[in-house]
Amino acid sequence: MPTISLQRDDLEALIAGPDETPSRIPLDQLEQWLMLVKGELKGHNSETGELRIELQDSNRPDLWCCEGIARQIRIKQRGASISYPFFKKQQRVARKLLVAPGLDRIRPYVAACTAVGYRVTASGLTQLIQTQEKLADIFGRKRRTVSIGLYRLAPIVFPVSYDLVKPDEVRFTPLGMETVMTLREILMVHPKGVEYGGILGGHDQLPVLRDAKGQVLSFPPIINSREIGEVQIGDDQLFVEVTGTDLPMVALTLNIFAANLADRGAVVAPVEIQSPVKTAFGRRWSTPIDFGAPRTIPLKA
């Protein structure tokens, strides 16, 4: 079960919500509220304000983060669920993500959204990264089923393409490195390539995310580009994508990030996914996607 770290001030602010002044929550009260998420307080650093919380609910990955815990407590306090406008059906979605043919044999699914207006804080960035790692490692089975990429939105020119390329066809500077590398070199040299490269083993083409100018965003599920994929404190325009092998899990993971960023004050906008093959969501769909909305599923002949 996941154990997460968070800042007490950050949790209190998220429980209060954007329109209220946060107040100090006694630890004994917090421990009672954590029962709502099957959580247990494992540690508290009074000097730094850090809380360590162990979560026991393996069926609720949306609770494996500061935002999810605060959301559940807020719902209990107010007696009503939270409505997110980005789940409403959009008449027109401005930004597109195009999936190339052939990815259905390797890593077929992708979901994405943008989030604008939340200026990333130190606590917020720590939570984004922690949630990214927990979901990819536990829910995403060490990135095999789900992996997540976070980017600075401003440099990206849409439409974004989810492409297949040869291992030596594309070069970029990956996070954690100072030099430009091919995908083959990343798999051989970069620590993340060595750790996760087996996911892509046996394929003579590899997945890459690029924008309309040809700028590389990432080599999923391995590593982001350093130029675009290194979110920093103070950034207020983000692009989030999730790739994987299970479409509902990919979409759910994207939903979690969208809700978390919205809870921090971001305006989340959907991205339209265009697939060359028919999926459970069709050939075109927008994410985030409301799993509670009615949906027509064609019967097999």
Task: Label the predicted regions.
Residues M1-A301:
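RNA/tRNA-interacting regions in translation and RNA-turnover enzymes
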